[in-house]
Design a protein with these regions (language model features):
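Peptidoglycan cell-wall recognition and remodeling modules
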Residues: 15-109
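Membrane-proximal envelope biogenesis segments
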Residues: 1-19
């Protein structure tokens, strides 16, 4: 045990990258939507935890809505208008980058 404490081994540094200030292009958003939900704005994951075209959790949706679009707090992401889902995804991207979509975020800059 003492040997491990005295010699902890290599460490990993994770570096976050800033989102592209110009933002993703339309075709990149389309690729993300297709990857997340085949572009279906009413999509619901098999567990029911992720909803809408961008597969928002209700908690993340309400957090972003509370910051920018109070009228959308409490709205089911899968029932929200497409333009509202698009705005919410763009707002989330500006705050957190593509990492909010762990698999499909690879389509965004």
């Amino acid at each position: 045990r003492q040997a491990v404490l005295d010699n902890p081994g290599p460490t990993t540094t994770i570096v976050a990258t800033e989102p592209d200030p110009k933002g993703p292009k339309k075709y990149q958003w389309e690729a993300l939507k297709y990857c997340e939900s085949t572009g279906n704005y009413q999509a619901v994951s098999p567990t029911g935890n992720y909803r809408g075209a961008y597969q928002f959790s209700v908690e993340t949706w309400n957090w972003i809505a509370g910051l920018y679009y109070e009228n959308l707090v409490g709205v089911d992401p899968a029932a929200a208008r497409p333009q509202d889902q698009d705005r919410m995804a763009e707002s989330l991207y500006l705050l957190r980058g593509r990492g909010q979509w762990p698999v499909c975020g690879r389509y965004l800059p």
